[in-house]
Each structure stands twice: as C-alpha cells, then as structure tokens.
Amino acid sequence: MKEETISVIIKPLVKSGVYKNEEVALKDIVVNHIESKISNYEKTIKKIENKYNMSFEELTDELKNEAHFEQEEDWMDIKGAIVMKEAWEKARESLIKENNYV
C-alpha cells in the first residue's frame, strides 16, 4: 500500500481530533488490530480447552491414544490458534520494540 493511500485513510481521523497525527493514528490502529487478533485466538483456545476440560498439552496426549474426527478437527483448530496467537504476539512485541511504542 502506498504511503499516500495510508495518509488518505488516516487523515480524517487526525482532522476529527481523534488522533494527534497520522503516525500516532497508524500505530494505534495497528496495535489495536494485533490485540484483537490475539484476543480472538485466545478465545478459540479457551473454548476448545473448556469443551474438553483440559489444556492443549493434555488434549494432545489424550488424542495420541485414540482420536475421533471431531477431536482431531478441534486439535487442529487449537494448534492453529496457538501458532497464530504466538505469531501476532511476536509482531506486537517487534512493533513496540522497534518503534518505542507503549
């Protein structure tokens, strides 16, 4: 995305007084998006852990013995959510570290 396109999208937020400047607006929007992604993956993880009343690690051990189709699908969903949550957490950490953003 070109810098001018980003500016066109962000400028109304600055003009309306919601943000001090475009840089602050963009950083806040990106951090909020990352936080939303992390929260959604945490909900997915918690939902599946609650469904089986066990942690991902316990579910993994349980499925080694015998798994049914639905359990395998749930395991793949929770595994994917864990991987993506960790990726978004790394992205957030990198953004904060590289931009001195708190």
Regions flagged by a language model, labelled:
Residues 1-60, 86, 90-102:
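Small, basic N-terminal interaction modules of short regulatory proteins
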Residues 20-23, 27, 34, 64-67, ...:
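Amphipathic alpha-helical coiled-coil segments and their boundaries
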Residues 48, 59, 72-78:
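Broad hydrophobic/π-residue packing in well-ordered secondary structure
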Residues 69, 76, 80-83, 87-94:
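Charge-rich amphipathic alpha-helical interaction elements
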